[in-house]
Amino acid sequence: MTQTLTQLMNERVVLLDGGMGTQIFAKGPTLEDYGSKELEGCVVLLNLSRKAWIQEIHERYFKAGADAVETNTFGANPLVLAEFGIPERAFELNVAAAKLAREVADSFEGGRYVIGSVGPGTKLLTLGHTTYAAMFESYRTQVAGLLAGGADAILIETCQDLAQIKVATRAAREAMAQAKRKVPLWVQGTVETTGTLLVGSDITSVLHAVEPLGIDVLGLNCATGPDEMASHLHALAEASPFAISCLPNAGLPRNEGGKVVYPLDPEAFAAKVAHAAAQHGLAIVGGCCGTTPDHIRALAPHVKNLAAPHRSPKLERSASSLYLSTALRQEPAPTIVGERTNANGSKAFRDALAKEDWDALVEIAKGQQKEGAHLLDVCVAYVGRDEVRDMDLYLSKLVTQVQLPLMIDSTEVPVIERALQKAPGKCIVNSINFEDGEAKARKILDLCKAYGASIVALTIDEQGMAKTLERKVQIAERLVKLVVDEYGFHPSDLIIDPLTFTLGSGDEAFRGSAVATLEALKAIRHRWPLVNTILGVSNVSFGLAPGSRHILNALMLYHAVQHG
């Protein structure tokens, strides 16, 4: 029985094909090949009109030594095809492309594989070019076609927008679930010469955002050559728990006499990629723009004898924004959450929200960043206003202008989902509890799992807020069992709040509450060392005079940090 693609990856480095577009255009397609002037340039139509061309290209790459070829579907999602007036043909064209590649792969002895190519499209979700729902359905349709046509893996490639990566991976998983066919899911970002994706994300931010999404490969392709990718491959090698792929261009392109020229000949390209594979522990290599069957033929003997890499990556558990990642455990502690972007806690924020002064709201967030906050708590709940709409509009402005990761603060499931659709990075959702049982907590956890978010959980159950050490630890245990054991979240993605009560109420029942909270912090850290904790420290002094509040807050913060 032929081994699976995953089995091959466990044995040795896997070799993919090279560029498809240049090979197609070298054949000189005409209007007749496309069918009409309006369809000119829609190369995915050649999967139907010029099947022999596409299969010949696949065959040449297999003969050059490739283990797998990518389907001719880079631009075959409905959003792209709509620009040619044929969005309804997406499924058909993806099935056709996958079947063409499948036929060629199966004609070779031994294991040869088909990788379903899913390109970035022409619209950036982060910049509001389309909606989350439209992009999700577009990718779901494309992946469904690739699966139906026999693809062995799905490759979401040449990614330029972190938000696009997240929606595409979720759509791919949905398509697999509907088809009852799970295949490896690969993601490749395109890091420009600026050192980031087109919208500004570095590769580490991408890693932290996709880490909870259950992909199998995270790598790089396009834009630059092997040399320019080195530092980004190093970052992945150090931290990524996923297999690493590298499909560079044949060097940095340059313009010579009006033509795009790639400087690396097959031998030079092969030497550089082989060096990168050995140095960074690459699992998959191949080529992108400017590479040909000759480049793959030159690369094959260098990498096909390389055993599957064995790395020991160390991933620092983090939240992330569009631009950067922030460790959940800061050194020195604590991690500071800015709360002035909260309509319940800031009059200035609430007043600006009432006026729909979005620029002022963004400036408040920028102020929190300047003052040293590590995360932003965002809450737009305001009586009489549409919270879903406000969250949508605010995050549309905020995510491109502020670097801090977001803590989404809402009790409403639709608001949380909209926020997770708008925020490109790895967010934290604030919060769940068991006040009304587990039903609502489970709905929120379902969203966090689907969108790759961490979760704040309060020590509140059906009996109310936990005031004693015993009750706090008891509810914490219940939270760990639900979030970590049942839902499968990494322990660090659970952030438990053992609750802080005011000492200014005069209520005898709360006299020892601060000590109980501190002891709960210590107990949680000791019993579940990877689980994180959080406190609303200033709650301890609520109702006291300003001078007293500062002193008590500082004292509580000091002891909270000492207790874990």
Regions found by a protein language model. Name each.
Residues 1-564:
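Domain-level signal for soluble alpha/beta catalytic cores
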